[in-house]
């Protein structure tokens, strides 16, 4: 993994910082695990924008990732590591002893040729997936399920991890990167180790066009709009908006709590750290 700072040969190159991983596969992805990925432009089925700042970008295929890791007792080997345009983490193509191939998230330190396994009998080793009841207290894990059999939902981005801090009855307590302490059923599966490609946070795109390649459109300030477009719009000359900051739909944007799922509050032992 190398971090390259480009020379300022032009305005667009001046601030570019690249993260280059020479271990990644340079050919095409495995065709049997690709799916069509359509562009929505941030619009819903009625054609209205429901997510702003989305549109354009390079055409992509979706890589079908195995987030469940339920091929128990069948040894597997990492064939190669690959780039995935759909996520910040890299992915690993895994070949099982029965001939099946699957993509999984590439853990930190994972290399081509590494043996991996899943199930209650799997060794406590980076890349192996086990139920939380079989993982030692204090272990660092990623790709954690929130419901048994549903597939990993927690700690899937590059460089993220979760620590198993306690186990009491049918629940394990996890410490998330945000500082939140949360209970998860002990039958939920997790993969040992951290997610790889932690250097992703060090990259700098350097120019607006690099964002456009990724399908991200510009963000316009509300005070620069007309009153018909935003609550902060309008006014003669430059204004401060005239009210507390809100979204285009009028929802307060700074410190306003929008969580409404009271049903799962009982699983949160401690709220995340306040910044």
From Swiss-Prot:
UniProt keyword Cytoplasm, yes or no: no
Keyword Acetylation attributed: no
Gene3D superfamilies: 2.30.30.30, Nucleic acid-binding proteins (2.40.50.140), Ribosomal protein L2, domain 3 (4.10.950.10)
UniProtKB keywords: Ribonucleoprotein, Ribosomal protein, RNA-binding, rRNA-binding
Location of the region described as Disordered in the Swiss-Prot/TrEMBL record: 223-275
SMART domains linked to this entry: Ribosomal_L2 (SM01383), Ribosomal_L2_C (SM01382)
GO cellular component: large ribosomal subunit
Assembly and binders: Part of the 50S ribosomal subunit. Forms a bridge to the 30S subunit in the 70S ribosome.
Family statement: Belongs to the universal ribosomal protein uL2 family.
Its biological purpose: One of the primary rRNA binding proteins. Required for association of the 30S and 50S subunits to form the 70S ribosome, for tRNA binding and peptide bond formation. It has been suggested to have peptidyltransferase activity; this is somewhat controversial. Makes several contacts with the 16S rRNA in the 70S ribosome.
Annotated protein name in UniProt: Large ribosomal subunit protein uL2
